[in-house]
């Protein structure tokens, strides 16, 4: 957690947790496995990343202004493939007013349960994404 210009901010990967055989088979074809510079071919490492992320999140206070994660904390409404757990990591409550995430490359901006969710995808160099500037005020 850090404070910047009066904003309390936290960030993590919030890594997902493949659980079923279908999830693991789907995961094996994902770009995360092929392009992110981590050894994610080992199931134990993937599960540990998820456990570490959940422990981090559970230890956060409930009054953050901004959380930034790679993986979204809920299913992205714009992602038709989003039912697979490789696209989100469920959390029980949202501990910030604003949550910015990426991972699934589907841009959106909506509010749910008092938290504004913003997907600001950048993507791989094979796609022409534009950088979106966002101004957040208290």
Locate the predicted segments by residue:
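Short, surface-exposed loop/helix-turn segments at secondary-structure junctions
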Residues: 80-88
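Active-site-proximal loop/helix segment associated with metal-binding centers of metalloenzymes
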Residues: 10-76, 80-81
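Metallo-beta-lactamase
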Residues: 1-5, 63-65
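Context-gated lysine
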Residues: 8, 33, 45-48, 75, ...
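Active-site metal-binding loops of divalent metal-dependent hydrolases
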Residues: 13-15, 70-71, 102-105, 121-124
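Hydrophobic/aromatic beta-strand patches that form the interior of the parallel beta-sheet core
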Residues: 10, 66, 98-100, 118
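Binuclear metal-dependent phosphoesterase catalytic core
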Residues: 3, 88, 92-96, 104-138
């Amino acid at each position: 957690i850090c404070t910047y210009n009066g904003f309390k901010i936290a960030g993590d990967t919030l890594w997902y947790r493949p659980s079923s055989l279908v999830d693991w088979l789907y995961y094996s074809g994902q770009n995360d496995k092929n392009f992110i510079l981590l050894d994610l071919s080992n199931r134990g490492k993937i599960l540990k990343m998820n456990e570490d992320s959940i422990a981090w999140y559970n230890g956060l206070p409930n009054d953050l202004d901004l959380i930034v994660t790679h993986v979204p904390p809920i299913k992205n409404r714009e992602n038709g493939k989003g039912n697979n757990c490789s696209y989100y990591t469920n959390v029980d409550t949202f501990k910030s007013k604003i949550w910015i995430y990426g991972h699934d490359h589907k841009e959106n901006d909506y509010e749910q349960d008092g938290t504004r969710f913003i997907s600001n995808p950048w993507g791989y160099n094979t796609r022409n994404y534009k950088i979106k500037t966002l101004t957040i005020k208290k």
